Regions:
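A mature extracytoplasmic/lumenal domain signature
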Residues: 59, 69-71, 112-116, 128, ...
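A short gly/proline-enriched turn/hairpin at secondary-structure junctions
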Residues: 64-74, 87-88
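Short, low-complexity N-terminal intrinsically disordered segments enriched in polar/charged residues
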Residues: 15-49, 53, 57, 161-162
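Surface-exposed, charged secondary-structure patches
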Residues: 77-123
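Short beta-strand edge/turn micro-motifs at domain boundaries
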Residues: 21, 127-155
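Hydrophobic pocket/interface hotspot
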Residues: 43, 55-56, 63, 110, ...
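Sec-dependent N-terminal signal peptides
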Residues: 4-12
Length: 163
């Protein structure tokens, strides 16, 4: 419970920070931060392509997903995430920008802004936080949380989606 409270506090704190302040935060890039960022990007590609095998490769099955919205916090297991990712009836597309990555030893956190599209139409944007661990010499997403409130002021520097 303490872990959930801290995670929620950090995400709420991030929501109150001026985006121009966050754009000035740049941490040193190295082989480890690059490999952590790669895993997060691959996970988002798995979501966007309904690639269940890629999702299972990069996401630890026993983890959880936390969704934070104005109407409350929702939880689901990564197993449920896998089922949703495998669902070919919905076209998901998610992309991120300006990731901030920190690590020490076999523990890492990636924080980023993102936008999300359903069936080719913009749905929402927000902040997303990933907890990763190095397991059998490779990074895997264990838990992640995201805000899903914003439908305005979602000016992605990536421009409109191209499929």
């Amino acid at each position: 419970m303490k872990k959930i409270f801290i995670l929620c506090f950090l995400l709420c704190a991030c929501e109150t920070v001026d985006r121009s302040t966050m754009n000035s935060v740049r941490l040193k890039s190295d082989a480890t931060t690059d490999s952590i960022e790669h895993v997060v990007k691959e996970m988002l590609i798995a979501i966007s392509t309904n690639d269940i095998e890629k999702a299972r490769y990069h996401v630890f099955e026993d983890g959880r997903v936390f969704r934070i919205r104005k109407d409350g916090i929702g939880f689901r297991s990564n197993t449920d995430f896998f089922k949703q990712t495998a669902d070919q009836s919905t076209d998901y597309f998610e992309r991120m920008w300006d990731p901030i990555i920190m690590y020490r030893g076999d523990l890492a956190i990636a924080w980023t802004t993102y936008d999300f599209h359903l069936n080719g139409k913009f749905s929402h944007c927000g902040a997303e936080s990933f907890t990763l661990t190095r397991f059998n010499n490779r990074w895997m997403v264990v838990d992640w949380a995201y805000t899903a409130n914003e439908t305005e002021n979602c000016n992605s520097p990536l421009g409109p989606i191209e499929k």
